[in-house]
Amino acid sequence: MTMLGALTGRQLSSGLKDQFDRYNRMDILGEGTYGVVYRAVDRATGQIVALKKVRLDRTDEGIPQTALREVSILQEIHHPNIVNLLDVICADGKLYLIFEYVDHDLKKALEKRGGAFTGTTLKKIIYQLLEGLSFCHRHRIVHRDLKPANILVTTDNSVKIADFGLARAFQIPMHTYTHEVVTLWYRAPEILLGEKHYTPAVDMWSIGCIFAELARGKVLFRGDSEIGQLFEIFQVLGTPMDAEGSWLGVSSLPDYRDVFPKWSGKPLTQVLPTLDGDAVDLLSQMLRYNPAERISAKAALQHPWFSDAMF
């Protein structure tokens, strides 16, 4: 077994030409820090797949930690609302991750729609996100980078959480993690304020931001810097106070300042007038300042907003 195989608990292919040649690359789907994602076809089955080519020159060991993390996590979790890792190939100095192919992500779906998601469609998407996330959290996985571009959507609005490169397994007590995670607009306030002992609640904040974005057709908190992001949040939810009913303990966070402007906030019903009472209630519980009071994915699935769901 290779080093990567030992780390992921799976025997990997090690440069066998026939294994690599099984996949015919068609076109580029995207490019990131560690490599390129292609649309490809499995010659053996005719199945369209997503082939992520990872460069192996980013660490002393050769394999980027984000790639190791993604492989090891996806080997542990299998769920209809989590993207399926089909194969792993290590060949020619590169690591290839073969995923099921889904032709849209939620960001593209929003752009194509040109407006908000409503009714059963919105409810189905949020429910599936919570199903996938609840499964992750039960298996002690915090995704840490939930955003529309990392959520795949099929033509029938089936949702699959993808891109686990930043994900970490969590234990109790919580480990100290870097706060440089999660795309700014979906980043939880405790991370923005320098908290390093964070919990799965950071994912629930991100889900709340995504929920609001789908419901209004545009980003809820659109900051252009960390402080700008905080102020965007404060203007909607009010500047948090270190007190019961707001965010007890917030003033002890490393980047909290007493001189923050004091905004009173505005009702979520005003920000999202198309949502009914149950939907606003669920969203408000996802966007609680205090992570200890933020609703969990498991509890959110039992919320009254889903009581009439027929999916």
Swiss-Prot record:
Its EC number is 2.7.11.22. InterPro entries: CDK, Kinase-like_dom_sf, Prot_kinase_dom, Protein_kinase_ATP_BS, Ser/Thr_kinase_AS. The modification Phosphotyrosine is found at Y34. GO terms for molecular function: ATP binding; cyclin binding; cyclin-dependent protein serine/threonine kinase activity; protein serine kinase activity; protein serine/threonine kinase activity. Phosphorylation at Thr-33 or Tyr-34 inactivates the enzyme. It comes from the Eukaryota. It catalyses: L-seryl-[protein] + ATP = O-phospho-L-seryl-[protein] + ADP + H(+); L-threonyl-[protein] + ATP = O-phospho-L-threonyl-[protein] + ADP + H(+). The active site is at D145. Residues 23-306 form the Protein kinase domain. ATP binds at L29, G30, E31, G32, T33, Y34, G35, V36, V37, K52. PANTHER family: CELL DIVISION PROTEIN KINASE, CYCLIN-DEPENDENT KINASE 2. Belongs to the protein kinase superfamily. CMGC Ser/Thr protein kinase family. CDC2/CDKX subfamily. Forms a stable but non-covalent complex with a regulatory subunit and with a cyclin. Probably involved in the control of the cell cycle. This is Cell division control protein 2 homolog 3. The lineage of its organism: Eukaryota, Discoba, Euglenozoa, Kinetoplastea, Metakinetoplastina. The gene is CRK3.
